[in-house]
Amino acid sequence: MAPLQAIRKYDYLVIGGGSGGVASARRAASYGAKVLLIESKFNKMGGTCVNVGCVPKKVMWYAGDLAEKRHHLKSYGLSTTDDKVKYGDFDWSTFKDKRDAYVKRLNGIYERNLKNEGVDYIYGFAHFANSNGDVEVTLTGDQELSFLEEGKEFKKDEKLVFAGSKTLIATGGYAINPPNVEGHELGTTSDGFFELQKQPKSVAVVGAGYIGVELSGIFKALGSETHLVIRGDTVLRSFDESIQNSITDYYTDKLGVNIIKQSGSVSKVEKIDGDRKKITLGNGQVLEVDELIWTMGRKSLINIGLDKVGVTLNDKQQVDVDQFQQTANPNIFSLGDVIGKVELTPVAIAAGRRLSNRLFSGDKAFENDHLDYSNVPSVIFSHPEAGSIGLSCKEAKEKYGEDQIKIYKSKFNAMYYAMMEDDSLKSPTSYKVVCAGEDEKVVGLHIVGDSSAEILQGFGVAIKMGATKKDFDSCVAIHPTSAEELVTMK
């Protein structure tokens, strides 16, 4: 068989059209680099975040949040009843159509931004073809590629080969289900959540991480009978215990999610009564629901011929990189979810831009440019929201020693709930500031309560700059707000 011949050589080949890949491609092109971006999902530029992640999830969260607020109206004299949203009140299918149309508009915006920056892009599966790093692309749909040949339509499954001086692997990840569970295929993943054509009357969500917490909160707020199956006693076990306990208790005691603790996970799934599912748990408990959602994590998309170019993986089967995003191959780089460091959209964007600054700007000021992965803020769009930056209380004690740590905590009902006599309507506000050393440097901040995502952004800047508790105290509070508690704690 004759060796493959590249039809065009680029300065930069970017494999993956998610947030990190697009950001790096555009930044490289802004410096004059000749860039080709390859995205496997046909006409779905933007990656997980735009298509099956943070963007459509946040739209669904807004719907759930409004549903929760509906039964607050009576307390403010705007309704004569305080009925909660019931199954059937929410027009799932119409809302899905609107949400999907919004995502489609974003796909188009991503494409236009690439064109405006002079980035060539193609829809197809990329695979390293040889040890030189040439990339073979199998097209995933019929498409015009005017940068190759004006007016010609290239056909689905056609193969094209490209060469690049530098290559970026930004392939992201995919949602998993447990293959060893009998009947696992009867459930869907968090990706499949966005494909549901109708709202399930009852649903089981399996997994205690932020995706499971967010989706179960949305389902319950919109009126579905909701079961959250977890192996331990709390949700969000990778977060500070204050967040774990606050969200677990609120979901159980007030929101009405049936959290099944110490479940032993799922041992078997069977189909019953049409499309309903019978779920047998490891602890012997049995659930019968309309829908099963697996939220048990994601794996890196690595099946692209990495062995041919000497790119190595870590023990979690994620692409191994150094602090400069460089793989074991000096001409191949990687970032985003596929490396598994901090799997957040803004992190991938920041890493991608810094990488292109270093590789293509020609500016010595950027020759050591790389992303600092510490003190990255993250939020959970639960009901209520939660946010975190820095070290948990446990992590801080392990790093600095227990005698060097001081904790400031506050738990209260936000002023918004003052008009409500029924305690079941009130969601908690819980704040924790973790400080280390004699100067009480703030090394962790963990908050639960309404608007936590918006509140955390500004405090994230302060903590990234090395703020101390004294700095917090010296800030004049904005009154009346919940956030003022963070600068008035004693």
From Swiss-Prot:
Organism domain of life: Eukaryota
Keywords from the named record: Cytoplasm, Disulfide bond, FAD, Flavoprotein, Mitochondrion, NADP, Oxidoreductase, Redox-active center
Main location group: cytoplasm
Top class in the EC scheme: oxidoreductase
Reaction equation(s) it catalyzes: 2 glutathione + NADP(+) = glutathione disulfide + NADPH + H(+)
EC number(s) on file: 1.8.1.7
Gene (name only): GLR1
Assembly mode: Homodimer.
GO molecular function, one term: glutathione-disulfide reductase (NADPH) activity
Cellular compartment(s): Cytoplasm; Mitochondrion
GO biological process: one example: cellular response to oxidative stress
Cofactor(s) needed: FAD
Record's keyword annotation contains Mitochondrion: yes
Note on how the cofactor is bound: Binds 1 FAD per subunit.
Residues where NADP(+) binds: 208, 211, 214, 231, 237, 297, 343, 379
Disulfide cross-links: 49-54
Active site residues according to the UniProt entry: 479
Binding site for glutathione: 19, 26, 110, 246, 353, 432
UniProt record similarity statement: Belongs to the class-I pyridine nucleotide-disulfide oxidoreductase family.
Function: Catalyzes the reduction of glutathione disulfide (GSSG) to reduced glutathione (GSH). Constitutes the major mechanism to maintain a high GSH:GSSG ratio in the cytosol.
Keyword set includes NADP: yes
Protein name stated in the entry: Glutathione reductase
InterPro entries hit by this protein: FAD/NAD-bd_sf, FAD/NAD-binding_dom, FAD/NAD-linked_Rdtase_dimer_sf, Glutathione_Rdtase_euk/bac, GSHR/TRXR-like, Pyr_nuc-diS_OxRdtase, Pyr_nucl-diS_OxRdtase_dimer, Pyr_OxRdtase_I_AS
More details: The active site is a redox-active disulfide bond.
Binding site for FAD: 19-20, 39, 48-49, 57, 126, 337, 345, 479
SUPFAM superfamilies according to UniProt: FAD/NAD(P)-binding domain, FAD/NAD-linked reductases, dimerisation (C-terminal) domain
